[in-house]
């Protein structure tokens, strides 16, 4: 229902007219956030505030996807630092919240909540390795977490890990991570900490 937003727009435009009639020039008029840019072009005026759409992410499920085609541009990548076999009955990570029900092959990923990777993904998130899903085992720690690579062949130290983005035919989006955590997907775009290096790619090359 756009009617509340339309009321706000009319009030803004009316106020702007009154101010200008009083002799005050307003060079820039701004109302639209990401959702407004897509759903209310009449509110875009002469400057807009594109936030989450810059990442190629729709602002909410209420925004029609056929108006503007967005493609996610942000990825979060890491690598495997350690791989080992653990026996059935072994507790994994702090607090022993996950106990292996069989022999498992476990890989360590050097990313944690200090990097902005949510602790709420403990025991329910997953990453991509070799284009396959690897479930998170136990708690996400400050600087690392563990994943099950038992069914993924030949995982070794140094292999790429995709936390957000695409690997082969599989994809992990920020929206999906938000759903897993019961949190707003925007948070993950904002939470990635300064200690995580930013790499910008243009035409397939780092810039």
Language model: regions and residue ranges:
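Active-site loop/helix belt of alpha/beta enzymes
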Residues: 1-79, 83-87, 153
């Amino acid at each position: 229902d756009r009617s509340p937003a339309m009321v706000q727009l009319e009030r803004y435009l009316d106020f702007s007219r009154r101010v200008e009639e009083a002799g005050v020039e307003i060079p820039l008029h701004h109302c639209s956030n990401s959702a407004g840019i897509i759903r209310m072009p009449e509110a875009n005026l002469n400057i807009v505030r594109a936030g989450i759409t810059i990442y190629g992410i729709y602002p909410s499920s209420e925004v029609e996807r056929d108006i503007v085609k967005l493609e996610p541009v942000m990825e979060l990548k890491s690598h495997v630092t350690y791989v080992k076999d653990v026996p059935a009955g072994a507790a994994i990570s702090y607090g022993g919240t996950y106990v292996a029900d069989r022999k498992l092959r476990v890989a360590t990923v050097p990313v944690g909540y200090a990097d902005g990777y949510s602790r709420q993904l403990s025991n329910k998130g997953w990453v991509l390795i070799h284009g396959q899903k690897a479930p998170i085992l136990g708690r996400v720690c400050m600087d690392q977490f563990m994943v099950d690579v038992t069914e993924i062949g030949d995982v070794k130290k140094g292999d790429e890990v995709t936390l957000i983005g695409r690997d082969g035919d599989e994809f992990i989006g920020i929206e999906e991570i938000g759903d897993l955590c019961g949190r707003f997907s925007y948070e993950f775009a904002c939470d990635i900490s300064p200690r995580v290096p930013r790499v910008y790619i243009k035409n397939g090359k780092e810039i």
